[in-house]
Amino acid sequence: MRARTVLAGLTLTLLATGCAPWHDDDGPEHGRDGLGQTHLVSAARGDRDAASLTVVSGATTLAVRAADLGDDLYRISTPDNSGIAPDVVESGGRFQLHLRSTGDNGPAAVEILLDRRVRWDLRFSGGANETLVDLGGGRVAGLDFTAGSSRIETILPKPEGPVTVRMAGGASELLVRAPEGIPVRVTAGGGAANVTVDGNRRSGIAGGTVFAPPGWDSAADRYDVDAVAGVSTLTITRP
């Protein structure tokens, strides 16, 4: 069952400091509220084949999805009546995402669309009640969830070489959907109440326990799921 369809309309919050914002200025009416805050920002892809994005501050829910964006590298949007509006800055070779208050009382919902042709290195530092990252139709260099979340779900594409999915902020549930035939090693660094890998369930997992399938060490393309912090339920499954 594909989880991708539940991502549209969910949210994300972001913060960046010390750099000038990168705005989308397609027109004075485009995505703007009565205070002049834009609710859609984007940037041209150019000849980029790889990009890095950091999400710094927290949100209720966070949604990221790989999509065909034409000439755009990314598109980030919030509802017209949202209490937050996105800015994008670039610092040290990474894009950072910032949401500022609009003064409205609408939902703090943010959707991030990433160009599917670009290989993305993503870092989530702000935390969320629910984090959904669907890169099943895209490319990934790495995922790093450094802040806590009640629930994290990610859909992964076929990796290009070794790729690490790191969770260091803690979570009640971590669900990873990996492609068929791709070996996945799991490290429960902070321990776990329950770990299920490809249907095999174990309970009461001590910190530092490693689950590695045969052939993982020698596989050219593979995933390494590193749950540095504790998690209640950790599941590795296939789409």
PLM regions and their residue ranges:
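Extended beta-solenoid/beta-helix repeat architectures
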Residues: 115-119, 125-128, 134-149, 156-162, ...
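Hydrophobic helical h-region of N-terminal Sec-dependent signal peptides
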Residues: 8-12
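Extracytoplasmic
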Residues: 48-50, 59, 69-71, 83, ...
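C-terminal motif of bacterial Sec signal peptides marking the signal peptidase cleavage site
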Residues: 15-18
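Bacterial N-terminal signal peptides that target proteins for export
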Residues: 1-7
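Bacterial signal peptide processing site
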Residues: 20-23
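Short, surface-exposed interaction patches in beta-rich subdomains
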Residues: 38-46, 77-79, 88, 94, ...
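Extracytoplasmic low-complexity, Pro/Thr/Ser/Ala/Gly-rich segments
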Residues: 25-87, 233, 239
